[in-house]
Amino acid sequence: MPAAPSFIQTLVGRFDLSVFDARRRRTRIRLAVSDDGIWDVVVADGAASVVTPDGRPDAVLTADADTWRQIAVDLSSGMDSFRSGRLSVRRNLHVGVGFLAATSGATEPGRLRFRTIATSGARLSIMEAGIGPPVLALHGLGGTKGSFLPTVAALAGRFRVIAVDLPGFGDSDKPIGASYDARFFAGAGIDLLNALALDRVHLVGNSLGGRIALEIALRHPGRVGRLALLAPSLAWRRDRPWVPLLRLTRPELGLVQLAPRPLVEAIVHRVIPGAEDGWTAAGVDEFLRAYLTPAGRAAFYAAARHIYLEEPHGEEGFWTRLRTLQPDALFVWGRRDRLVPIAFARHVADALPRARHLELDCGHVPQVERPKQTHAALAAFLSEAPDAPPSPRSREDR
């Protein structure tokens, strides 16, 4: 095997196990330099070493030599390269981006890191960066904390941003038999805050994560500062003809039902039409990584079932409860969203006259499809809170 380039040797030489969340005793990361070669890095026994490429790696990182040199100098260049498509991270964002964070050479408080938190109910995988008022980011159905990489990069200069894999998804536990409804997820969120010793946080939620953020705020208003809800999944107001059938259908059927990758790719393209191809490919990888496990499929179907079955009206109905929401809220809607039509904004405005609204030309994942506009709005909104720090220029505005 030819010697690894100096920039790869620099990265490996800086490896810091304390910020690398290895879920296995032996982790293999493949580093590909376009038109120049491939090298594997194996993390085992607390150290990282360059070895001959072999077998199936846990993550594959691909970039040209100039991009790798930039990453070796400054991790933020790696995040910029990933967002722009110059760096590809495939198979496992948790491992791939976690490796970059562990080889950045950064030592200051608030640097990007990945870790697993043992809560009272489950082990939850988180990605966090920054110092300041805490912001908890909750991903959507079938997603992972990786969908908030742009958010972490954009807001970490002013906030401590924590993105979590919800139970049932990503690298978090996937308990068989859990209800995976809004109440269950809200309880998991509070368990995480308790484990992190956080009394109060701002919440940012996308899709299912938006619904969970609302549930946390409705049940525990004293634990929530402000709410930023990105295309949140809300209870359907109109007739739902499939309700009787879905009530009879058990989510455990997901234990045996698979989905081919081409089908998943087509769905992801429709859901996030404004995303770069690299993001779409990574999103498909992240979805399939959990979905291809029986417990992950069961969690997905259970959560999807509860979104559709949630009672919209009546004393305990969602829209009745929504009127009692206390924290200030910002709703971000996508004009091309096929899952949560923008017509929901009118119903939210009726229930919450003081809530703010932003419409963007995107689909269902604004933080990925329209990162500059989304994060500018989030930074401005969250900075109005009494405990927010002064406003430096964000990286995305430079």
Task: Tell me what each language-model feature is.
Residues 163-204, 208, 376:
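Active-site loop/oxyanion-hole signature of alpha/beta-hydrolase fold enzymes
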Residues 218, 225-258:
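Flexible "cap/lid" loop of the alpha/beta hydrolase fold
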Residues 325, 331-333:
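Short beta-strand/loop motif that positions the catalytic acidic residue
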Residues 354-398:
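Catalytic active-site module of serine/aspartate enzymes centered on a nucleophile-bearing elbow/loop
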Residues 1-115, 146:
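Feature captures hydrophobic
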Residues 94, 98-135, 158-159, 198-199, ...:
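Alpha/beta-hydrolase fold catalytic core
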Residues 259-323:
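Conserved alpha/beta-hydrolase catalytic His-Asp/Glu region
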Residues 122-171:
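Conserved HGGG/HGGXW glycine-rich cap/lid loop of the alpha/beta-hydrolase fold
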